[in-house]
Amino acid sequence: MKIIHYIPSLDRASGGTAAYMQLLAKELGKLVELHVVSHTSNNPMKMENCEVHNVASMCHPLEMNRQWTFLLHEIQPDVVHVNCCWIPACAFIQKWVQDLGYKVVLTPHGMLEPWIMKRHYWTRKLPALWFYQKAAVMRADVLHATAESEKENLLKLGYN
């Protein structure tokens, strides 16, 4: 099986999701052909048992799309796993991947929890929900919760 994981940053300063990806790759990479796609970082975490690919950022969306399309055609993954929310690049990548016929797993990593949804709701969350986030959650082939409480809160949203 071939899996591509996308994470916006593998930088040591980027927090829990990068640390999660480091631990996941170390073990999952023993079982499957694992590729991790991210963006260039000054201080990236060491990744084992996977191939790391850096693509252009959303500052260069056409180049990012071109690089993603190339990677997808080269790797031919069975699934693409997007690990993020609230970042437009995540929604664009998911759309591009699904438009090419690949299955997508979306893991919000707690970013759709009620307390986070309430934070900056009117200025950040609501516009993002309107423009891309709700559609991304609805279009995901699989929505992956990292805890039972997150699963319950995702089900309450009713998006997927």
Indicate where each model-derived feature is located:
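A short, charged, and often flexible helix/loop element on the N-terminal side
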Residues: 45-75, 79-88, 119-125
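Membrane-proximal helix-turn-helix segments that form the acceptor-binding/catalytic region
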Residues: 112, 125-143
